[in-house]
Amino acid sequence: MQNSPWFKENPLRLFITGRPGVGKTTLIKGLVSELRELKIAGFYTEEVRERGERTGFLFVVIGDGSCPLASTKPIGKERVGRYFVVDSLTLLPQVKQRLEVADLVIMDEIGPMEKKIGDLWKLIQGVLSSNKPVVASVHRSMNIEGKRYELTPVNRDRVREDILNEIRRYFGTKQDTFSL
């Protein structure tokens, strides 16, 4: 299906942006759960908290484990805000392998932190220049071409439905294929 010229010329590009804590990662994780019928590759980030305070982030490969991404403790040379960013990600080979057979790529987040990790940034750029359909959360500062959704506490449910409908249209599936 994705070898047709239409898919190559019109790759799906849906991007979610919004303030920190508004629910971007929750939405991304929900999409992964709801779209089980598709082969999904990619990653999302999860907060690491100690005594109620955010102290870092984990890099979670969809369906294949997690590893540190950033920490308030020195785990790499580069910094973004108060976080030290790892120099490389141990699970990047798993992401690359899964991308080859994926129907849909989901990434959370594309932002300054991810840009500091050379191999990860190359992978993100490669995905964005490919014909693979992509749904990703992006930092407000990133200028990436595609349809952008500004997530707020008020519009979370509508944005979720809109994104699911866009994916349905793209893959030509029936309305009831994916649960709402």
From Swiss-Prot:
Cross-referenced SMART domains: AAA (SM00382)
Reactions listed under catalytic activity: a ribonucleoside 5'-triphosphate + H2O = a ribonucleoside 5'-diphosphate + phosphate + H(+)
Group of enzyme by EC: hydrolase
CDD domains registered for this protein in UniProt: RecA-like_Thep1 (cd19482)
Organism of provenance: Metallosphaera sedula (strain ATCC 51363 / DSM 5348 / JCM 9185 / NBRC 15509 / TH2)
GO MF, any single term: ATP binding
A Pfam family of this chain: NTPase_1
Record-listed ATP binding positions: 18-25, 104-111
UniProt EC number: 3.6.1.15
Function: Has nucleotide phosphatase activity towards ATP, GTP, CTP, TTP and UTP. May hydrolyze nucleoside diphosphates with lower efficiency.
Keyword annotations from UniProtKB, A to Z: ATP-binding, Hydrolase, Nucleotide-binding
Record's protein name: Nucleoside-triphosphatase THEP1
Family: Belongs to the THEP1 NTPase family.
